[in-house]
Amino acid sequence: MDEKIELKLKDWLFNAGLLGFINILGEEAKSSGELEIDNKNRLIKFSPKVLENFEYKYFDFFIKRYGKTLTYGKILEFEKYIDEFEENDNSLNQEIIEAINKKIVMVKKAFSKKYKTIYPLLEKGFEDNILELEEKIKKLNKKSTIKDIKNTFDLIKEILKYCKQDIYDEKGNKKKYFEIEDIKNIIRYGWEGIAFLDIANLAIKRKKGIDVGDTYKVYRDFFIKDIEDYLKEDKKDFKLRCINSNELLPLPTKNKDDRNSKYLKTIQFLGDFFNPSKKLSNVWNFYNDIYVTPIVYLIYSCVPAGFIYGKNGKGIFINANDNMEKLEKLNNTVFYNIFEKEQVNENKLYKIIFREFELQNQEKRYEISDIQVVRTFERKELQGKSYPIYKFNILSKNILFFMFQNSEKLNSFFEKYYVSLDNDTNIPKWDTAEYLYKVIIETILESRNLYSTIDKMCYVRMSNEKYRCNFNGNNLCDLLEINIKNIRRLEGMEKAGGEVALTLKNITDIKNNAYYFRKEYIEKSKNENKIKGLQYRLQNALRTNNVNLFMDILITAHAYIGKEIHKLFIRALENEDEFKTLGYAFLIGLLNDGNKENQNEGNEQ
């Protein structure tokens, strides 16, 4: 039992579990020598002693990381507000009443419904006392006085007095039932349907009088108890191998009383993965050997501690799997930098990653290598349970260097956005806001060009009555230049002695040319609305890659004012990307915004 257990970095999901396991054990386990990080061999070593009271460390980690953002944490924050309110004896107004009522609703809902499953675990009479106090709490109204508020606050504080009573197990470990009830929602982002998240099965057992214990015991029974037995087990007759750690496992049998079957664990609880007990037609010769050891099973239970979760279960894990130090440092750096105001600021994510890699590159601490960014978004319902759907981006060496080379222009899009306006009130609908830095980076990571983003940005600028935005024509020109470089990177078009690529100067020349064309066109037509019609027709031709239509519209419009088209448009006939780049540059110039300095440049034909 004293021999250390070794686990190597593997696939992204197991790596997320390993990182979660390290996070849960914390620096104390490293300092004591019970947990060792071996970067050279990409593995960790840990003593079985770390499993003592592991269930408490497990939940304490989540409480520390997310507690303040969840219901019980917010109720405790409200208690601070109550104390300050009493001290300051604030005067009442409608705004204060509405703010307090929101908190009152939260408190009543939590203690009358959400936390009811906890009450049977507490001292006799606890539930009756809490529900009696909760029933007395009423929302405030216009006639409410300071005295009414203080009476309400006294009731809330009385509830919290009950809840904050310390409860310990026989070993002196503190139990945090209310926090755990909230934390279950975070853990559910990573896995579902077993242990303390198998709500229906636990309820049935309790109804039958079976003592399943509290959440701590349920976790230990599910994930730790079998490890202790497995480590003591004589494995000489075991013939199967764990698909992850390659450790020995017993062969599966149809005998339900086989005591060794408890060591055969599956990972179906993590999501839409293969269920070994069903669909044996999916495996060779109808014989399933896809099992993991109890130790690996425990690591997979730590997956939610490896991800960084924000609002509505949006999660992030960076699978920088060169070594454990890099994996741990990069993910924890991202957490501390983007987890602010109780929400993950997604717009900051990639900027932080690139900055960290740039610093590492400068310090020559790590060789730059491909890394995988794993994200969770919506959920998938399977047999009444909700599992995460994962999305993957690869940050290759090629992409990372491209980002470093273009960091100045890319960073100029940070905090740039567009948002649609409400049709009736003309107020921005901020839940629809698109942040350009994130959109641009993700498009590049998916190895796509940026034409659709450029097109959308042009449409936004052309539709002032529908959108609000904070970018201009110069930003669009920068994006066209980034796009040219990105396309040449993707297609390997950089050739010594080959045709010279379009430059930012070419793009700016066309934009400026369009700016002066616009002025002359409006002067000739005496109707500014005509330019809008021209913008939409040109955009349509660009969207459909119709060079002939675009050139017909362009030549006709120039002929109308007696002006020749710019000589650079000859290149539009030879190359689709140059056509779209020059076409959008001209469209941007027609938008009549951006920095007007040096607009004389490019006015020549």
Model-derived segments and spans:
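Long, contiguous all-alpha helical interaction modules
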Residues: M1-K184, E378-Q605
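Basic, glycine-/proline-tolerant helical and adjacent loop/strand elements
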Residues: Y168-V344
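Domain-exit/linker segments immediately C-terminal to small folded modules
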Residues: N260-R448, T453
